[in-house]
Design a protein with these regions (language model features):
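Contiguous, small/hydrophobic- and glycine-enriched helical/loop subdomains that border
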Residues: 81, 103, 107-144
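ATP-binding N-lobe of GHMP and related small-molecule kinases
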Residues: 1-94, 112-121, 157-158, 167-170
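Solvent-exposed alpha-helices and their adjacent loops that cap or buttress functional pockets
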Residues: 32-33, 128-129, 135-138, 155-159, ...
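Conserved, helical-rich catalytic subdomain that frames metal- and/or nucleotide-binding sites
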Residues: 50, 139, 144-239, 254-267, ...
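Short beta-strand scaffold segments in enzyme catalytic cores
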Residues: 14, 38-42, 133-137, 143, ...
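Residue-level recognition of strand-loop junctions within catalytic nucleotide-signaling folds
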Residues: 17, 252-255
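Glycine/serine-rich anion-binding loops at beta->alpha junctions
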Residues: 85-114, 132, 239-253
Length: 282
């Protein structure tokens, strides 16, 4: 039996192109892994099965973890199965790659469990058929993600940046989010290059100035809860941004003491919100 940690991701930038002939959208994004995570245990078995001991997630073949296991055995030609156990802490439908990170962890875990010696890069390439965020989650750390998310340019991670993750009690489907962007034709300036430079220089002010997500302009008019969440978080006088297609946001505190203060303030004001302390990880 082995254990894999599935780290959530945030988008420091997310620019979305127009819809392509294949139905997908091209993106340009800086993604970073964070410490908020799910835990997955894997044990050899004759078939593929999944049990969830904490939190909620789809069961059976609807779950990307099961699909990832099927993909692994199909690609490697190995005979066998796996018993998967999930402890779920990453919020679902939050734009944090929760399902994607779980699938990525299954691929990495099976690679270890069966001593398959498949490279991370190959696992990432295989995973693109399951979901656009999964290749990044296989590799983790930090990267510029282009294409539909599968073209990765690794960046040096900026580890241990304190942050807060906030998710109001509203869900946003990714398909609906892209549909709203196409309908409204709203886009913001692409700050990805500025963000990459800020990360290279370890310039916090420049990083904060580069935060950008096209989905905010597309979704805020549709979901007042998201607009109100953003307005409230900005009133705390720290940089904040919605991640992915929502509905989670992250806030960048000035330091760990400020992180503790903001956590207490937000929890007291909004007891029905998911609020978690986290940090960036390598």
């Amino acid at each position: 039996m082995i254990t894999e940690i599935a780290y959530a991701k945030i988008n420091f930038t997310l620019s979305v192109g127009e819809k392509r002939p294949d139905g997908y959208h091209s993106i340009d994004s800086v993604m970073h892994s964070i410490s908020l995570s799910d835990t997955i245990t894997l044990e050899k078995a004759s078939t593929i099965s999944l049990s969830i001991t904490y939190g909620e997630a789809p069961k059976g073949k609807e779950n990307l973890m099961v699909q990832a296991a099927e993909l692994f055995f199909a690609k490697t030609g190995l005979a066998g199965g796996v018993s998967l156990t999930l402890e779920k802490r990453i919020p679902s439908e939050a734009g944090m790659g929760g399902g994607s990170s779980d699938a990525a962890a299954v691929l990495r875990g099976l690679n270890r469990l069966y001593n398959a010696n498949v490279s991370r890069e190959t696992l990432a390439a295989w995973s693109a058929s399951l979901g656009a965020d999964i290749p990044f989650c296989v590799l983790g750390g930090a990267a510029r993600c282009q294409g539909i998310g599968e073209i990765l340019s690794p960046l040096t991670p900026w580890a241990d940046l304190p942050l807060l993750v906030i998710r109001p009690p509203v869900s946003v489907s990714t398909g609906k989010a892209y549909g709203e962007l196409d309908k409204r034709h709203v886009r913001s300036d692409d700050t990805t290059i500025s963000c990459i430079q800020a990360m290279k220089e370890r310039n916090k002010d420049a990083l904060q100035a580069s935060l950008q997500n096209d989905f905010e302009a597309g979704l805020f008019p549709l979901e007042p809860v998201l607009q109100n969440t953003s307005t409230y978080l900005k009133s705390l006088q720290r940089p904040c941004l919605m991640t992915g297609s929502g509905s989670a946001f992250f806030v960048l505190p000035s330091n760990e003491q400020n992180q503790d203060q903001l956590y207490d303030i937000i929890k007291a004001a909004h007891s029905d919100w998911f609020v978690s302390k986290a940090r960036t990880v390598e």
